[in-house]
C-alpha cells in the first residue's frame, strides 16, 4: 500500500503539479509532506497526517515551515552553528 501511495504522489508531482503552479503556503510543500509522512510513519498514519495537512493548507492559512513530526527536519537547528541542541545530563550532587 505504501508503494502505491508513493507512486500516486510521484505521478501527481510529474503530471499535475507543473500545470497547477506553486500554491502551497507551507514548506515543505503538501506533496513533499505527504511523501515524508508516508515514508516515516507508514501508509495509514502518513495518509492521515497528509489529509490533516491538506485541511490546514488554504488561502487564509498563514503557512510557514511545518515539517513532518518525528523526522530529522522536525529537530530545531541552531542558526549560527547548524547543529541541533543537545541535552547534557549533569551528575547530581
Curated annotation (Swiss-Prot):
Key words, A-Z: Cell inner membrane, Cell membrane, Membrane
Record-level GO cellular component terms: plasma membrane
Membrane topology (UniProt): Peripheral membrane protein
Xref: Pfam families: YidD (PF01809)
First-listed, main subcellular location of the protein, grouped into a coarse class: membrane
Function: Could be involved in insertion of integral membrane proteins into the membrane.
Alphabetized HAMAP family for the sequence: UPF0161_YidD
Name by which UniProt lists this protein: Putative membrane protein insertion efficiency factor
